[in-house]
Amino acid sequence: MKRPSGRAADQLRSIRITRNYTKHAEGSVLVEFGDTKVICTVSVENGVPRFLKGQGQGWLTAEYGMLPRATGERNQREASRGKQGGRTLEIQRLIGRSLRAALDMSKLGDVTLYVDCDVIQADGGTRTASITGAMVALADALKVIKKRGGLKGGDPLKQMIAAVSVGMYQGEPVLDLDYLEDSAAETDLNVVMTSAGGFIEVQGTAEGAPFQPEELNAMLALAQKGMTELFELQRAALAD
């Protein structure tokens, strides 16, 4: 089996995390997984949603979108259609769930964190790139809150979060699928993990024949290998 990109089966794409990419948001990152590029920002606002008022904890929510020409052909903006699509809603809920797992909300204070992930170029793995990049933007936003005199109850960041795709391509497990691989894969799996080694989410779909337990285990092992590298890239980015 030869991958279209020439990568080894267990090889990530070239990944770059550029911090402070925009000047207004408390945290901002340009994350690049090969040719997939996503701008991730985290904005801090005082107050929490009504369902959390008086409970002494903060909140995090996420939104996701793609520029019309992030793909090979122009897509109509969802705003001009008047509603978000099912895929968009699914992905932004995944991003929010994943990043909330990084935080102790009781230490966040009476604030809401708004995570915005905007895909400017898509070549597969946009949701996993969004989570991995937004995690770094979130860490930066927490530093800003602390500088402003917040986080009196301690650091709310419990652990780092990252995500990666794996799949069965031409009968073999591969790591970090690009668009060509994703569109032809027999199985596509998105995995979200913590830096402590726990799983937050495993989303898997067989596009053709069902995948077998041993194939699932092989894909998860590849994902764990990729996570080790992703967490190191996050740490290196935050150390700059």
Curated annotation (Swiss-Prot):
It catalyses: tRNA(n+1) + phosphate = tRNA(n) + a ribonucleoside 5'-diphosphate. One of its GO terms (biological process) is tRNA processing. One of its GO terms (molecular function) is tRNA binding. Transmembrane segments: none annotated. SUPFAM superfamilies: Ribonuclease PH domain 2-like, Ribosomal protein S5 domain 2-like. It comes from the Bacteria. It is an enzyme of class 2 (transferase). InterPro entries: ExoRNase_PH_dom1 (IPR001247), ExoRNase_PH_dom2 (IPR015847), ExoRNase_PH_dom2_sf (IPR036345), PNPase/RNase_PH_dom_sf (IPR027408), Ribosomal_Su5_D2-typ_SF (IPR020568), RNase_PH (IPR050080), RNase_PH_bac-type (IPR002381), RNase_PH_CS (IPR018336). Its EC number is 2.7.7.56. Keywords: Nucleotidyltransferase, RNA-binding, rRNA processing, Transferase, tRNA processing, tRNA-binding. Phosphate binds at residues 87, 125-127. NCBIfam families: RNasePH (TIGR01966). Homohexameric ring arranged as a trimer of dimers. PANTHER family: EXOSOME COMPLEX COMPONENT, EXOSOME COMPLEX COMPONENT RRP41. Belongs to the RNase PH family. Phosphorolytic 3'-5' exoribonuclease that plays an important role in tRNA 3'-end maturation. Removes nucleotide residues following the 3'-CCA terminus of tRNAs; can also add nucleotides to the ends of RNA molecules by using nucleoside diphosphates as substrates, but this may not be physiologically important. Probably plays a role in initiation of 16S rRNA degradation (leading to ribosome degradation) during starvation. This is Ribonuclease PH. It comes from Pseudomonas syringae pv. syringae (strain B728a). The gene is rph.
